[in-house]
Amino acid sequence: MDPRKVNELRAFVKMCKKDPSILHTQEMRFLREWVESMGGTATQKAKSEENTKEEKPDSKVEEDLKADEPSSEESDLEIDKEGVIEPDTDAPQEMGDENAEITEEVMDQANDKKVAAIEALNDGELQKAIDLFTDAIKLNPRLAILYAKRASVFVKLQKPNAAIRDCDRAIEINPDSAQPYKRRGKAHRLLGHWEEAAHDLALACKFDYDEDASAMLKEVQPRAQKIAEHQRKYERKREE
């Protein structure tokens, strides 16, 4: 047999091994029938594997899209976002050294800084107030009210994330004080975190009723309830 034809046949067989689906084309029907008449089988395994490989990314993309794409049940929730702002991204503020030694003299110095900070706040000098409250915190980092006061200034500066950090610290020191919950509730409201805002403002009113906190609670609570009800409805749909 012509060696050239043998080489061509060898190349063709190699190609068929790589992609047996070639044997399933109409023009190769005669060869497929001959293979089967000899007791062999001409499967499409390689082709199907190739198709699977080609289809898998599409399937994966489709699954990802389905996961990322909110269902009609999720996307039909409309909440009034009036007053919601973009989150602040400043580096975390100084929190002081909680292991610092605090003498009576240091406490007096911290109190002087606090008084000066409140005066600056009353004069509308917000950044000066922040700086003075920070000085007070560095002197007495275990006094919850200092963090709550500084948080109130951060809220005025529309820096809710900074306010939340201060409130978290204040609550860690004294979890029974109303002020940190009130400030944190206001900060969450600025970010559109309705459920968190409602939770904190409700606690603030529970610890020490405040008309301002109560008024804001009445504003955010319907939105928080709407979200909670929507989530329950969505979960029931998924369980079905």
From Swiss-Prot:
The protein's GO terms of the molecular function aspect are:
protein dimerization activity
Tissue distribution of the protein:
Highly expressed in bone marrow and weakly in placenta, pancreas, heart and HeLa cell line.
Positions of the TPR repeats?
110-143, 145-177, 179-211
Principal subcellular localisation of the protein: cytoplasm
Region Disordered: what ranges?
38-94, 220-240
**Protein family (similarity comment):** Belongs to the FAM10 family.
Quote the PANTHER family the UniProt record gives: HSC70-INTERACTING PROTEIN, PROTEIN FAM10A4-RELATED
Q: Please identify the protein, giving its name as recorded.
A: Putative protein FAM10A4
Encoding gene (name): ST13P4
